[in-house]
Amino acid sequence: MKKKSVLLALGVLVLGLGGGALAALPSLPTPSILDVASPNAREISKLFWLVMGFSIFVLAVVVAFMTAGIIGGLRDRNHDEEPPQTHGNLKLEIAWTIIPLIILAILLVPTLSAIYRLEGYAAPEDALEVNVVGRQFWWEMVYPELGIVTANELVAPVGQPVRLNLASGDTMHSFWIPQVAGKTDLIPGNQRAMWFTPEREGVFYGQCAEICGDSHANMRLRLVVLSPQDYEAWVAAAQRPAAPPEDALAQEGAQLFVQKGCINCHAVQGVNAYNRAGPDLSHIGSRTSIAAGMLPNTRENMIRWLRFTDTVKPGVAMPNLGLSQEEAERIAAYLETLTLPEFDLRAAIRGEGPQNHVNASGYPVDEAGSLSETEIASMEGDR
């Protein structure tokens, strides 16, 4: 009796600690396959509920038989005779082999039907075409028919089919935005494609779903779905370069951008920066996030990203340039000026606000998206 009490107390303690840990976690944007935003996701959700229903039914039957056996055993626990044995019972063995096969066959039909509906049709001719390349640890987005190049944020109009031509630039990745489509693996040397039609406006969060290195968990992306009018305005703005910086601090940052070698890896539309080893920064000032969806796009976060790149995102190809606080402030001020001309993307997004995040390095981000001063000191110590 004493042993049972100890085990019960330990169980309560574990549950309490687990609940406390969950309560202490910040509110993360958690995409769900059940909160569908496209016909493709609806097919997957319907199949999920069908399989879940069968699973619950099977579980209920198994638990019912187990309960009956336990109750029967308790009633007969004072009897010495051996209970009936089923070993070698051919009828029972055939039954518990055939019944699961029947259940699997029943589930196979809607599964194959859903796969055919999702992958058996070509994208409509009016589909928006975007080339997506997964790289450690970010996403390159190219609109070939529009001449637009961006990174980590896929912008599309509501109600229009979107065809994604998927490829990997280094190792295996998997493209996944749960609310609009299933996973598609990206294998080096292979071209893949998928398409979907977003049904509502908003921001939908995605993630690389294939372990691809140290910062796999930090390889995020966002699908920004706009109204047709806002999308047309975004296209017109994205096809134009950002205005030259007028502020003295930003102008100094533009010079440092060249002097520190940033120009060797990053393209900026309208200036002599065409290399695309890293993300295109032409309109980074208008994006909702930086570091592939890890941090909200604020000047404070940009400064910390520039100074502590390899600490915020371990394994990233971007080198730590050893920038001083003043140098990082100037470059961040310059990057902040690289905005979409005459278009405010954040204002066009419905219901988008500051999110709480914890990056995979373990450094928490507060409500404004800025790392705490304690964590900054920790990062400086790591260097």
Question: Which stretches of residues belong to each language-model region?
Answer:
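Non-transmembrane, membrane-proximal soluble domains of secreted or membrane proteins
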Residues: 2-3, 20-50, 63, 70-276, ...
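Globin-like tetrapyrrole-binding proteins
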Residues: 55
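N-terminal membrane topogenic signal
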Residues: 1-12
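A short, flexible beta-alpha/helix-coil linker loop
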Residues: 286-290
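Seven-transmembrane alpha-helical bundle of G-protein-coupled receptors
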Residues: 58-62
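Core hydrophobic alpha-helical transmembrane segments of single-pass membrane proteins
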Residues: 12-21
